[in-house]
Amino acid sequence: TNCLLGGIIKVIIEDSLIFIRDANEKLFVFDLNGKFRNMIGVMGNGPLEYTSLSDFYVNCQKKFVCILDRIKGKIYRYTFDGQYIEEFDCDRSVFNNVIDIHYVGENKLLLNMNNHIGTLYNYALVNESSYKLEQFLHPYPVVSRERISNGMLPTVVYGNGNIFYTVLLSDTIYTIQDGESRPIYLYEGGLKHINYEALQQETPYQSIFEAEMKLIKKGYSGGLLQLFQLKDHLYFEICQGEECWNIFWNLKEQTGFKYNSCLPGIRIFPGKVQTVYENYIVRS
């Protein structure tokens, strides 16, 4: 069988366009009807070609898309139609450890970082004009000996002028105001919140997830997982013991509701959430 796409890695919907990165290191653009429009960039070793599609992001305000080539240490910038604009050198000490790049307005990028011995922080705030580090955010309380991250799950949302993001092993949702990280919501699900003191009880750990599993058995929450912003709601997931909750929080009314998607024999929301569009959840 012939299939245009390989396995889907990352999806972003902006400006009525669907940007899809697949497992073959290609970046496709479709319209909202699913019609193919164009590719972004060309993979190769020649001029203006990227060697690796390590990640991508979309600047929804200035209407361009950028590809990170970790091998070359480059950021390639294109129009939504796939026309090359320019390229930038990026700070390898930062971008070599990034797993997910998010545009968060005001000429800023928020980078979700791997958790391992070479990276001590969950996030890096980067200037989009220079691709230089401005500051690291949220030191990891446990550093894994392997490359581990929650970056394969979408954990940062930006829309309607709002920035929300989650931190590994935390029940808190944060925002960025005046260049500073600030807590804005705390999910109370009846379990204890993981903190630094709790994590130090049984050190050392091989990985941060080993620490998580040990603390869950002691009655601690495993922290928030993926996070999205619908038209009026924040949508996020959290696993607490054997229960996995899908939670919808109305930003205007400051009320919410939740579903347990791990009831015996029932999976209410099957598949991985790739992105959202208005009030629709896109799963694969």
Explain the meaning of each model-derived region.
Residues 3, 41-48, 90-97, 140-144, ...:
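Short coil/turn segments at the loop-to-beta-strand junctions that recur within blades
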Residues 2-7, 35-62, 69, 92:
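Blade-loop segments of beta-propeller domains
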Residues 16-22, 63-69, 107-117, 124, ...:
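Short beta-strand elements that form the blades of beta-propeller/WD-repeat-like
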Residues 184-216, 252-282:
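Conserved blade-ending motifs and adjacent loop-strand segments that build the rim/top face
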Residues 50-53, 69-121, 135-145:
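Asp-box/WD-like beta-propeller blade repeats and closely related beta-sheet repeat scaffolds
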